[in-house]
């Protein structure tokens, strides 16, 4: 079982799989970042084990970051979902999302709520070791919808800076290396 870890700042963090995390901030806000759950091929995390989601942040829309989003919204219909502006329409179509809780995000935008602030930062998908980039949009299955959503996942990517109600800051920074 994947346990929630508590840090001295009061933040609770649980790795879900791949790039996915569940985070509980000191003020109580529950965030999911790139949650790939039951569908994951390695170490799936059951959606049924998630008790709450107030905010869902997608760095990009490759399936290993976004495939669970439709099921998450069905379980937590009030959750605010943040996704790149170019990817939003295809994401809604692919996973039949309620657009009222979807935030189309561009780099530099800031979203302020009572319990946190979310800032979007431009990012770039990293290459794997050896220089291979396995997630290119044109390498995806021939399903037109999937091809489009994967293409946008390769086209735009976001990092996020979260400021909790107590002033604690967290940076969501994607990539396979710290270089």
Predicted regions and their residues:
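A short catalytic or substrate-binding loop motif that flags glycine-/basic-rich loops and adjacent residues
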Residues: 13-17, 151-154
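Beta-strand-turn-beta hairpins that frame and shape the catalytic cleft
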Residues: 5-12, 25-31, 110-119, 163-170
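Short hydrophobic/aromatic beta-strand or adjacent loop that forms the aromatic wall/cage
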Residues: 18-20, 108, 155-159
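Metallo-beta-lactamase
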Residues: 147-179
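Short, hydrophobic beta-strand segments that form beta-sheet elements in well-ordered domains
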Residues: 12-15, 30-34, 80-84, 101, ...
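Active-site HxH/HxHxD metal-binding segment of metal-dependent hydrolases
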Residues: 45-111, 116-131
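A short, compositionally biased domain-edge/stem linker segment
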Residues: 1-6, 19
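Pre-active-site segment of Zn-dependent metallo-hydrolases
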Residues: 3, 22-62, 67-75, 128-146, ...
């Amino acid at each position: 079982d994947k346990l929630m870890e508590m840090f001295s700042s009061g933040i609770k963090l649980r790795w879900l799989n791949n790039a996915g995390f569940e985070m509980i901030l000191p003020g109580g806000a529950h965030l999911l970042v790139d949650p790939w759950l039951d569908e994951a091929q390695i170490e799936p995390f059951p959606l049924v084990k998630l008790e709450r989601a107030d905010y869902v942040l997608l760095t990009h829309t490759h399936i290993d970051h976004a495939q669970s989003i439709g099921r998450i919204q069905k379980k937590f219909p009030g959750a605010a979902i943040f996704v790149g502006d170019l990817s939003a329409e295809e994401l809604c179509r692919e996973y039949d999302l309620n657009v009222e809780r979807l935030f189309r995000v561009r780099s530099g935008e800031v979203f302020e709520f009572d319990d946190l602030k979310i800032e979007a930062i431009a990012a770039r998908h990293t290459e794997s070791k050896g220089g291979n980039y396995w997630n290119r949009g044109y390498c995806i299955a021939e399903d037109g919808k999937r091809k489009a959503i994967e293409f946008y996942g390769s086209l735009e990517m976001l990092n996020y800076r979260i400021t909790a109600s107590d002033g604690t800051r967290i940076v969501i920074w994607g990539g396979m290396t710290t270089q």
